[in-house]
Structures are given as structure tokens and as C-alpha cells.
Amino acid sequence: MICADELGPVSPRTFAPPPGWSADGHRIKAPLAYSRGLDKAWVYGALRVRDGCALTRTGPSRNTLGYLDLLDRIAQANPCGDLYVIQDNLSSHTSGPIQVWLAEHPRVHPVPSPVGASWLDLQEAWWRLLRKEAFAGQTFADHTEIEHAVARATDRLNARAKPWVWGRPQPTPRRYRRVFAYRL
């Protein structure tokens, strides 16, 4: 099972640092410069749930060709067995070229997530890790620097990947300081 999604647009700018505190007890802040420009990048990603490894690519826009390239990379990275790709309901996921590609690759089965249930797609949670690893506290001049940061961050996250599970982990059992025993 693979979760696929798009992130973006990511514009070249200064991103806020990760939450943290300085040695003297103040929040770490950075001067932020925000501007809207034509130079931006979209990040396409696929998360393999069983081992936590991800596959990313960047593109200049969010369209059918970018998603088609992501599907090709997913099929090449997982050469055997059926692939169930969990995806959102974007129109580019159901376009004509995608349907033709899916007909040529019968082992790839798209599974659309229900409307309003993006939390079911674990790729959304993985984007949070990528943003923190690639963008936090960084300044980018153009889309090529964003592409480089995404590739490096994906490699670092894949190096320490673990299987993903839906739901929250069980809380650790509390240890009581006193044990009360009642007698009748």
C-alpha cells in the first residue's frame, strides 16, 4: 500500500525555524521575507506504509504529467506485487492519460480517499516531517534550491524510516507511587 499526494506550491522564501528556545529562554525567531512570485515548485510524494520509505519529485506545476511521472516512479520502485495507491480526489488523478496508464499497468490500483477525509492519507502526516527536515529555518533563492533540499531531506528521512500505522500509539502504563489495599 502506498499513499500519494502533492505538496505546494512551495515558493522560494525564508521559512520559519523549527520551534525552539535559545539559551537565555527566548523563542528562536528569524526575519521572514514573503513574496509571491512566479518561481515555485510543487512536491509530489509517495509513502510506502510497510517500511516508511518515501519517494519524492518536484515539478513546476500540479498537473497530470507530474502525477503520471510519480506513478511511473512508484511502479519502478516497487517492481513486484499489486500496488494500492491511496490518493485524494484531484481531477488530475482521474484524467484520461492517467486512466490509459492504469490500463497499461493492471497491478496498480488507485484507491480514492473519501471527500473530507484527507487524514486517512498518511502522506499528509509525512509532509509535516518533510517540511521540518527540508524547509524549517532555510532561505531559498529559486526552485532548484527547493528541489535540492527536498531530495536531501527525503534521503535523510528514508535513512531512519520506520513502518507507519494508523492511529495513536498505546499510552505507557502509569506507575503509581502508592498502592492502596482495602480490607473488609
Explain the meaning of each model-derived region.
Residues 65-84:
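Short, basic/hydrophobic alpha-helical segments
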Residues 3-5, 46, 52, 71, ...:
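Mobile genetic element proteins and their domesticated derivatives, centered on retroelements
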